[in-house]
Amino acid sequence: GLNCAFAVIPCDNLRKAFKQNVEGITDDANITGLSALSAAFKKGWKWRDDLIRYLNKNLETLLNAIENHKNASPVVPEATYLLWVSLKNPKRKNLQSHFEKYGVGINDGIEFGKKNNIRINFATNHQNIKKASKRIEAALINL
């Protein structure tokens, strides 16, 4: 990758804790990454706005598929392309394996300390989301 990322953290205490936690884990940005970052800030706003609209359409498709399932509660993301879904009393222990049987790759929340939750990455094309939504619905019905 371009090896160039940053975080804007207004809270002093949180910013200090963040710096301590990433020290030694991340590399410094390289010149190519800095050039790309500069171009993005100068000319990338339309692309960004288009991307946000695209991702929101994907999110809406997923939410429509999930909303009819009383045992699934999605948590609408604030600033990411990862949708968390809380599952009420799933019969299956291995959620990742269950969803894979339906052709959907999810992350089991247990990896992140969130038992009975799944994480869905919706940063893909609309066609994939439409297919995945139908598969997710089937997986939820048989959960």
Describe each PLM feature range.
Residues 1-56, 63:
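Conserved core segment of the aminotransferase class I/II
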Residues 71-74, 104-110:
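A short linear hydrophobic-aromatic micro-motif
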Residues 38, 47, 54-63, 73-86, ...:
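Conserved glycine-rich beta-strand-loop-beta hairpin in the small C-terminal domain of fold type I
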